[in-house]
Amino acid sequence: MILEYDGVVVDFFEKFPAHWKNIGIHVSGGADSALILYCTALMIHSRDQLNEVKIWPTISYDAAAPNCKVHNIGKDVVKYIQDLPIGKSIQNPYLHTYHQTDIDTESNNTYLREARKYLFNIIGCDTVLDGTTRGMPGLPRPTGSYDPNEEELIAMTKQPGIEFVFPFATVNKKFIAAQYNHFGLKDLSNMTSSCVISSASPCKECWWCKERYWAFGSYDGGVQ
């Protein structure tokens, strides 16, 4: 399964090792991680490995905001894909809280220690996939948000010796939107959330709302 858009190719899902038996995926509630969950499940299904390979989603949420919409969206995303014919390899999500001071600083990602402990020490995952993508041309991410440089992004897509893999590290949100269109995943797309404001509707002003509109032609939920 090779993903393509505008001359750019992502072949990670075609080439990921057949011997991987336990794959962790951090589901943030956003469009990137939801697509990774879908594509991984689809690849396992197409390889006829449903009885051999398991996907272990994790959902993290701020202990200070346990009812944050992203927490609930993450659960909805997992359930939606689980219920598809391709979703039988997806296990129920592991939910855990975190505090802003509980960030893993031992590597170049922001995975939480609790997720690492669960996925590697308890489950024994072969790898963990994350939905980091490139930003928008000409509009840098806000100060303080994770924005790796080109060299780091390329390194993230390499599998050997790296625990956390970022399949979409070298593509932007327009590539992601094109895949949702290709697979006919409008309902799943509208379920995901980009806005960082915890409210019932997208703010349309934050960087992530602008990125969403730039790529999808609409805000969260298909809002214009």
Model-derived features with residue positions:
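Nucleotide-activated chemistry modules centered on ATP-dependent adenylation/adenylyltransferase
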Residues: 1-224
